[in-house]
Amino acid sequence: MRRNAAQWPEKTAFSTLDGRTLGFGTFDRRVNQCNHVMQALGLRPGARVAVLSRNRVEVVQAFGLTKSGLVVVPLNWRIAPAEVVKILRHCAPDALIVDAHGQKLVEPLRGQLPEGLQLLSFDAAQSGWRLLADLMDSAPEDEDPSWQAATQEIACIVYTSGTTGTPKGAALTHDGLLDNARTAAADMLGLDPTDQVMAVMPLFHVGGMWYHLFPCFAAGCSILLLSDFDAGVVLRELQDRRITNVHLVPTMIAALLDHPDAAHADLGAVRMLFYAASSMPPQLLRRAMERFPSCGFAQGYGATETGVLTVLGPEDHRRARDSANESLLASCGRPFSQREMRVVDDEGRPLPIGAVGEIQVRSAGRMRGYWQDAQATDRVLHDGWLRTGDLGRRDDDGYYYIVDRRNDMIVTGGENVYPNEVEAALFADPDVQEASVFGLPDPHWVEKVAAAIVLRPGAACDPQALLQRLRTRLAPYKCPKTIFLTDALPKNPVGKVLRKALRERYEGEPR
């Protein structure tokens, strides 16, 4: 932030659809003011500041609180209010900053929030909330905060639900974030200060942080910040603003290609389209490469806990297209420099090339551990290696392929959904006796959430009515797209439900 403000003070750092622009110099001054406000409220290095908001410039300014050693905790605004409260009570922040949507989300449960929590709003404040902009206007803007960040300390805590649905906060250090930012900017996205980047991924997600925000800071790019994805708007802005670099998930790419404006939109300025969150069906990737003929394509592999790890770059995509070698497109690429990866068996012993096992990683960008959860940390960290829980293999050329997810996680529309969490919500319904949740292939979502349920004796439940009740307990993207009623669930001899058998049974079902 300091370097960009000194080198390009008048250059646009951020712009928005409503015509707002913010230069690097002004942005740095607003960040200073935000830090001074927090210090005046009594926050000191190590204090947590939770942020619950859709994408907007003020969210980026809040990330700048790391400048004074504060720890930023970005929250998913799509989750249910009870889930937000659970995370807030776990990380015990000193301040919560929200937009109007976030305020509406937590207001009904305000009595359950941690005691002493400073309540701040980006928008009009209700009773008990303070408007952050008013506090910032009287704060110093040309002075760096008196407290400074230590590079080895925690900068962010990013929450990811565990397989049991228990929230786990990955503690990411300043050094780790900087390592990921520089690696992504130079080796994955090929950014330079002339790039115009469209940021549409949510900033509470590492996809928005690692593939938009932090790499653009590292390279000095200008960012068009969108609050939501709308295919027509994205096509228009790609064309009119001459966007050069954009990161989308496969579901978004499919929506762009299917939009009526796609056929005549001028997308010639786009030189890099990065996709992640899930693999892309080969037929969809072929369509995208035909529609963006002069654009380089890249995809990466990583996780909240690991940082960015691999890239399948533009040259790999061109080689796969020109040689009709579609199998390469199923790869997540090769590791970056200073990233170590290996495939191991259940005992942690390295496996030979081609063998399938768990992928483990070692890198400067990985998390320090899970916040306030030593047991969960010990389960995934051992001798410097992080156990990803992903099953994969490596080929002779060093390319990695993700084969399956050991924990049965579902990636739908770029969002991670854990079956046990959805099952717990289903089990809470009075009509449900047994339930199992699994992923099924879907042409739009790539993978959709599906559930097979056994009703309680005497229950006559309509699946749509069950879904309506479920939406009061879970975020919409976690709710099953399809519910199958069955008399019994397939189980192994010890009574464990066989999700693989359910996937095989229902794959291709029209319902």
Predicted feature locations:
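Conserved AMP-binding A3 loop
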Residues: 21-26, 155-179
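Conserved structural elements of the adenylate-forming
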Residues: 27-36, 151, 170-192, 200, ...
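Conserved AMP-binding/adenylation subdomain of ANL enzymes
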Residues: 178-196, 206-245, 259
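Conserved AMP-binding/adenylate-forming
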Residues: 20, 35-79, 416
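AMP-binding/adenylate-forming catalytic core of the ANL superfamily
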Residues: 79, 96-98, 246, 363, ...
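Conserved pre-ATP/AMP-binding loop-to-beta segment of ANL
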Residues: 9-10, 127, 139-159, 166, ...
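Structural core segment of the AMP-binding/adenylate-forming
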Residues: 40-41, 70-134, 457-459
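Gly/Ser/Thr-rich phosphate-binding loop
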Residues: 243-248, 259-327, 340, 350
